[in-house]
């Protein structure tokens, strides 16, 4: 099977899932073509079954904004024709599902029809998709897809609530390869904390929805009760809030490490005692799942799909969005009881195993085969 994957190249959840899915399929012998504006962050281009096609947008003075969607549709059309792809998989409704539909119409003129799968990841539905400028286009592109998947039950519910979707949405959760989180040979905790200190960690793109200011406040509250350090991994617009916090709290500067983007995230997660995720919205909570795979319990909000991953009182604790006091108290409770912490570390790993790649990949493979079969049946009716 030859599969075209359309995705963002960034470190965000949708890009990571799309890349890991494509590489896993390539490892099983599928031919996988990535179409994006840049090389996806985690993509191993040395795999002989992986192909990358960069979308280039030519600048032209007439356009206030360069027409990426048109260039994307043209590249999809070209790749499908050149490599005889069997299926397209768009990760994120805008612009990928919309551009893929346009490419499908072009291909139909050549009598080269191809099925399209669209995976909904979150802000394409909960934020971007609900804006009046995009809503109708998002709804249209989803309904024009031949199969639709969502990364959580919560996101499926939101999609059906906000849009008039005429097709079934199949929930296929995000996944991780647990084996990547089992090697701690290079983990050196003493690089970040003293033996008598606990380590809290937060990983995100530091957008406002991640509420990094609450991460900092939680740590400030916890540090008063438990000797601890905070590690923040990621870059984004709210880094200014972090810098402002440090200016206002100079006594905490030596207790907070800012690492930016890191490649071997699992090595840092395995050093940590608690993962903080007070997000305003999370369609699934992939960062929380990665933490659990590294034996790290999660203190989080109950936003979106997080409760489907983080189980209250078992793998960590959840609180209402914005309830910094509750999240602080839960963290103090957990870090003050080594027996409870050890139990939750074990529970977190067991929960992560349920979302292992080996369990989720066959679901995608079956969905692909079914989509292609159904698409061919529909073509014979025309």
Describe each region flagged by the PLM:
Residues 154, 175:
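Carbohydrate-associated surface elements
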Residues 312-313, 317-324, 333-338:
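Conserved acidic donor-binding segment of nucleotide-sugar-dependent glycosyltransferases
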Residues 297-300, 310:
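Short hydrophobic beta-strand element within catalytic cores of glycosyltransferases
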């Amino acid at each position: 099977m030859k599969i075209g994957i359309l995705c963002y190249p960034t470190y965000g959840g949708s890009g990571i899932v799309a890349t890991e899915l494509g590489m896993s399929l390539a490892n099983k012998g599928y031919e996988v073509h990535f179409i994006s504006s840049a090389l996806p962050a985690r993509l191993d281009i040395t795999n002989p079954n992986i192909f990358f096609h960069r979308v280039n947008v030519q600048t032209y003075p007439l356009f206030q904004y360069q027409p990426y969607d048109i260039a994307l549709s043209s590249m999809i059309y070209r790749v499908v024709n050149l490599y005889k792809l069997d299926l397209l998989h768009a990760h994120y409704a805008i612009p990928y599902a919309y551009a893929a539909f346009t490419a499908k119409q072009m291909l139909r003129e050549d009598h080269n029809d191809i099925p399209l799968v669209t995976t909904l990841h979150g802000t394409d539905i909960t934020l971007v998709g609900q804006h009046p400028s995009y809503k109708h286009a998002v709804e249209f592109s989803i309904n024009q897809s031949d199969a639709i998947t969502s990364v959580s039950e919560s996101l499926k519910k939101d999609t059906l609530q906000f849009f008039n979707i005429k097709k079934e949405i199949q929930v296929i959760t995000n996944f991780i390869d647990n084996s990547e989180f089992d090697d701690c040979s290079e983990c050196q905790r003493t690089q970040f904390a003293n033996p008598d200190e606990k380590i809290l960690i937060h990983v995100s793109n530091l957008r406002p929805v991640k509420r990094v200011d609450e991460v900092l406040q939680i740590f400030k509250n916890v540090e008063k009760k438990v000797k601890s350090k905070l590690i923040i991994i990621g870059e984004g617009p709210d880094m200014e809030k972090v810098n402002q916090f440090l200016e206002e709290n100079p006594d905490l500067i030596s207790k907070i490490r800012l690492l930016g983007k890191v490649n071997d995230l699992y090595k840092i997660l395995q050093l940590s005692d608690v993962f903080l995720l007070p997000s305003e919205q999370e369609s699934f909570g992939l960062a929380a799942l990665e933490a659990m795979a590294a034996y790290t319990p999660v203190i989080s909000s109950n936003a979106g799909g997080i409760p489907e991953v983080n189980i209250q009182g078992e793998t960590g604790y959840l609180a209402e969005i914005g309830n910094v006091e509750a999240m602080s108290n839960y963290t103090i409770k957990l870090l003050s009881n080594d027996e409870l912490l050890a139990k939750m570390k074990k529970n977190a790993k067991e929960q992560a195993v349920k979302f292992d790649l080996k369990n989720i990949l066959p679901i995608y493979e079956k969905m692909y085969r079914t989509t292609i079969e159904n698409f061919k049946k529909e073509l014979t009716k025309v």
